């Protein structure tokens, strides 16, 4: 059990946790160009006897050393969400065996723990150090790229995503993220090229459909955008997708369909102010002006900027 726990630790923080809020997302308002950076989620192996990182030498694990004793302590601290102590134990582990080939992974783990604590610059430095040690490690590049997005260093993120597709041309997450960054920059041609490349490598890709949905919405093709959103929603519904499809329905005067999506989204996340803003827009289109004003206030109460709320409904 202890060995399994240590090995789990070695892989755990290489993954960008779903609880790091999309931090790794580029976001704009629902009535503007909506974009988001996909997070890569991979299964954590439950048991293994050897450990290797992409671009690193495979090594056997001896769990009897002080190096792994520190890791076990670090994992206990992580389980308790005691990030500062976990950080200390990882540093002690690295210091105990400076030449251990697993250190690039520990440094990446350290970066992710720092990210949890909001130490973004320190996290970037440590991701960079880990990547210098294993330059072709796609997961590390992806982690640093998503952190660059969180730190509003979009050009650096783009550079990392491009490195990923140079190593692995069929990596759909990286291509999706590149496409979404181009979309944020209003470079629609390059965005479309990335989404088409995803389709070429992965004909049934949901990410390709999602990217094309946002692209069509950004370029005013709301009917086609709604169709793409529908394909993704069938397989993997989310509030973001429902809200964006609802907005497309509003733009094409399909008010009943928009109402269904808005109500479904509000049932899932009733604290999302933008959903009330969408509903206010719907009610205004139905000439329910008093109800629309109530929803505008609800949107503001749930964190929407008052100026944005009023501007969106002009």
Describe the residue ranges of each PLM region.
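Terminal, low-structured helical/coil segments at or just beyond the last alpha-helical repeat
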Residues: 29-30, 46, 51-61, 277-314
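Structural marker of alpha-solenoid helical repeat scaffolds
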Residues: 96-99, 133, 167, 201, ...
